């Protein structure tokens, strides 16, 4: 396949909004300036449109490019998806040409599985952080990729808090987070009649497809109509090393406009 559908952040620049989306173009621009942007890559808006042309399927050529750029990300970061010794975790985010805040989908902590959670707990010496990240990933992936009810996951959390006699999520300890992981997986299996995916590359492709699909979810369609944004633009997808906001009291994440 001659057409380029995937760009490392340092390959693009801020003028390429039509192809890389607003987020991807700005990440590229900041990378070019030498700012400390966590490594990642952008799957273009053209890949999104091709996905719809191919009956909502990511074709083999685009998949091959995604895997090629994942390999580059792993080499740059020194981490690998699913690695038992030094695992890579990524975020998968939408990025349309025009800002559409909250309209499309995001998946965080992708790459988590049973083995990786144990490794992260050991590497950080922080079991609570590791299993909190894992349960958040299961919850988000189940909702965004598989369409399960967000409400039921929140109810499960409330049930565990009630059993423990606490009211704040911050008071849930590492053992509570481990219990939530198992309860979330059980709900997933009961609803979908299959196990939660352990293979990080399967997780990644599922998440990318979900972001492409979110371009045409009802709230995104409504937002585009209200703001005169053409449906033909499509959305880019940004895959980037995770930055954690839940590792402790000395870290956080936010959005600046």
Model-based region annotation:
Residues 1-257:
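Nucleotide/phosphate-binding sheet-loop regions of phosphoryl- and nucleotidyl-transfer enzymes
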């Amino acid at each position: 396949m001659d057409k380029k559908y995937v760009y490392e952040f340092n390959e693009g620049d801020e003028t390429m909004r039509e192809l890389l989306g607003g987020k991807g173009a700005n990440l590229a621009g900041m990378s070019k300036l030498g700012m400390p942007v966590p490594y990642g890559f952008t799957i273009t808006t053209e890949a999104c449109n091709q996905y719809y042309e191919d009956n909502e399927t990511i074709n083999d050529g685009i998949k091959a490019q995604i895997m090629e750029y994942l390999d580059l990300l792993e080499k740059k970061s020194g981490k690998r998806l699913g690695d038992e010794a030094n695992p890579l975790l990524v975020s998968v985010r939408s990025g349309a040409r025009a800002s559409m805040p909250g309209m499309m989908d995001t998946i965080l902590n992708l790459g988590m599985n049973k083995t990786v959670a144990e490794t992260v707990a050991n590497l950080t010496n922080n079991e609570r952080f590791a299993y909190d990240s894992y349960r958040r990933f299961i919850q988000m992936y189940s909702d965004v990729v598989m369409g399960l009810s967000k409400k039921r996951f929140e109810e499960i959390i409330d049930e565990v808090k009630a059993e423990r006699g606490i009211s704040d999520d911050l008071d849930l300890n590492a053992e509570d987070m481990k219990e939530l992981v198992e309860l979330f997986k059980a709900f997933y299996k009961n609803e979908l009649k299959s196990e939660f995916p352990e293979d990080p590359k399967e997780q990644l492709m599922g998440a990318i497809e979900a972001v492409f699909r979110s371009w045409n979810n009802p709230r995104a369609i409504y937002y585009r109509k209200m703001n005169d944004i053409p449906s033909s633009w499509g959305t880019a997808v940004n895959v980037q090393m995770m930055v954690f906001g839940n590792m402790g009291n000395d870290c956080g994440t936010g959005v600046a406009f």
